[in-house]
A protein has these predicted regions:
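C-terminal cap/substrate-recognition subdomain and adjoining C-terminal extension
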Residues: 94-185
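Alpha-helical substrate-recognition element adjacent to the catalytic core
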Residues: 2-5, 9-115
Length: 185
């Protein structure tokens, strides 16, 4: 179904582009943001085959909300939804997301797959991710990009809906519901 004006956002499915830190990986305590997931669990993410920019093995404690992860997994499981990771975790992003409980299909695109953990600065991250996601939008895919570096809330421009989160609270329940709605669920 296409809404009046032919918005690309009226079709089911599309790209769900996720950062990890500040989106799925949260502060240990509730940030007091309306609608935030308040359950927290500490996960030690270990990717021993990789080294970070300091030549140390990748092994980091992160905090996640199991309830949020379950809700995001439901969005990833919607028909036609394609997961894209856009995180400075670089080559470790897929494994980090999986260890945190995220459903990461084999078809996932990790925009920074070949990059060392910590080697992607935020300006480069945003520019390179935007280039990739613009290609997706130009090919007719609906794109929803969630990152704590975006302006807070939901903004659509150039065929991409950006979702700005609080770096401490990450995705909130209402945000996940809106993302689900945008991707046809």
């Amino acid at each position: 179904m296409v809404s009046e004006g032919g918005s690309a956002l009226a079709r089911a499915g599309g790209v769900l582009a996720l950062d990890l830190d500040g989106v799925l990986f949260l502060s240990p305590e509730s940030a007091g943001v309306a609608g935030e997931y308040v359950d927290r669990r500490r996960v030690r993410v270990k990717v021993p085959r990789l080294r970070d920019v300091w030549e140390m093995r990748v092994s980091e404690p992160v905090w996640v909300s199991p309830s949020m992860i379950a809700d995001v997994n439901a969005v990833i499981g919607l028909p036609g939804v394609r997961l894209v990771l856009v995180s400075s975790w670089g080559a470790a992003a897929v494994e980090a997301a999986r260890q945190a409980g995220l459903m990461v299909p084999d078809s996932v695109v990790n925009v920074f797959e070949g990059r060392t953990v910590g080697a992607v600065n935020q300006d480069v991250k945003l520019a390179e991710a935007l280039t990739y996601l613009r290609e997706c939008a130009a090919a007719g895919e609906r794109v929803v990009w969630v990152d704590d570096l975006h302006v807070p809330g939901f903004v659509e421009h150039g065929g991409i809906v950006t979702v700005g989160t609080s770096e401490d609270a990450g995705l909130t329940g209402p945000m996940v519901a809106q993302v689900r709605s945008l991707l046809g669920g």
